[in-house]
């Protein structure tokens, strides 16, 4: 066996190595660049006269601070709505009771049929209410988990970080995009990792594929809004489609990150997104901002409708980023938060090329 092993060994071979003198000689023969100087005085262009700084400032002004859910507090409007809701429910109940009694007075089978219909309606209504309550609780659980992860990273307690990351793994267990990340985290259960690094590892392994999918969802919605705005004949059609696409995008974002909102949950998310945009003053885009963004060769080539399509697409992207902040179960730490500049090149390629040539 040892003889066979010796036969399989690589036979000795010879190869030439360049001498150090030859290498040094080759380096000496390489021509060196002679020192040079500027013939004219270098003049620094101030920011006020820079023709390209306007575009950068315009794009940066489109970026939003991270969206946070609004604080829920009891207001007089909610008290009034609850009181009138109870009153309307009692009125509906009395009307149904009177209707069933009248049907019984006419014929027993009509009365029993009405009772059966009312029972089916009540059961269906309770199921709908249960689903809505579960959806609202799921959204609240996501925000609670987000706060717990941030607190665990700030405190540095490994046990709290382990418990919070385990809850995150359980939340995303049904998403096949996180299978590889969950397996990777399972391998580190016995390792000694401090809390900030454990949370950053969890973010990279679990949320990186979800963030890529979220960016794809936002970009797809923004492109569809841009196309519809460019070809639609009426502004009302634009507004209706933007609302429809935004609601669809927000629901997809919530489902991607583990939330399953019902109708009330979706309305709550949309209200939080709109409130965030309103507070930051980011709902409307002025004509000067449009000219700054589309001014480098693109506005002169595109029609006004196409320019409006690009702007509406950017507004949709801002709504998507705000929805991503609200639905994501972790704050951005190890991964970069998306910005409007990430979508500007896809929505307006000419602008990206102009900025690249300017740089």
From Swiss-Prot:
Its main location: membrane. GO terms for cellular component: plasma membrane. It is a multi-pass membrane protein. Keywords: Cell inner membrane, Cell membrane, Membrane, Transmembrane, Transmembrane helix. Signal peptide: none annotated. Coiled coil: none annotated. It holds the Pfam family DUF697. Disulfide bonds: none annotated. InterPro entries: DUF697 (IPR021147), UPF0283 (IPR006507). It is found in: Cell inner membrane. Belongs to the UPF0283 family. This is UPF0283 membrane protein R01807. It comes from Rhizobium meliloti (strain 1021) (Ensifer meliloti). The lineage of its organism: Bacteria, Pseudomonadati, Pseudomonadota, Alphaproteobacteria, Hyphomicrobiales.
């Amino acid at each position: 066996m040892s003889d066979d092993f010796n036969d399989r060994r690589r036979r000795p071979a010879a190869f030439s190595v360049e001498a150090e003198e030859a290498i040094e000689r080759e380096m000496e023969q390489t021509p060196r660049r002679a020192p040079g100087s500027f013939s004219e005085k270098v003049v620094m262009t101030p920011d006020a006269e820079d023709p390209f700084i306007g575009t950068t400032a315009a794009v940066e002004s489109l970026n939003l601070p991270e969206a946070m859910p609004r604080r829920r507090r009891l207001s007089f409007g909610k008290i009034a709505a609850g009181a009138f809701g109870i009153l309307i429910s009692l009125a509906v109940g009395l009307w149904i009771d009177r209707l069933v009694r009248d049907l019984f007075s006419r014929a027993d089978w009509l009365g029993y049929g009405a009772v059966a219909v009312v029972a089916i309606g009540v059961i269906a209504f309770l199921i709908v209410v249960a689903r809505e309550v579960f959806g609202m609780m799921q959204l609240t659980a996501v925000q609670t988990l987000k706060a717990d992860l941030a607190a665990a990273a700030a405190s540095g307690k490994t046990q709290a970080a382990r418990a919070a990351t385990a809850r995150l793994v359980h939340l995303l267990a049904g998403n096949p995009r996180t299978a590889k990340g969950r397996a990777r985290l399972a391998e580190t259960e016995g390792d000694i990792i401090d809390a900030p690094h454990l949370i950053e590892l969890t973010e990279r392994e679990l949320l990186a594929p979800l963030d890529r999918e979220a960016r794809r969802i936002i970009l797809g919605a923004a492109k569809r809004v841009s196309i519809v705005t460019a070809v639609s004949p009426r502004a009302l059609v634009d507004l209706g489609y933007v609302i429809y696409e935004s609601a669809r995008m927000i629901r997809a974002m919530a489902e991607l990150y583990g939330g399953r909102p019902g109708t009330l949950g979706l309305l709550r998310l949309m209200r939080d997104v709109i409130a965030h945009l309103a507070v930051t003053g980011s709902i409307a885009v002025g004509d000067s901002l449009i000219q700054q963004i589309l001014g480098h060769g693109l506005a002169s080539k595109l029609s006004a409708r196409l320019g409006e399509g690009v702007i509406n697409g950017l507004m949709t992207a801002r709504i998507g980023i705000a929805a991503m902040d609200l639905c994501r179960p972790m704050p951005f730490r190890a991964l970069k938060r998306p910005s409007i500049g990430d979508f500007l090149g896809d929505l307006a390629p000419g602008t990206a090329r102009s900025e690249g040539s300017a740089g």
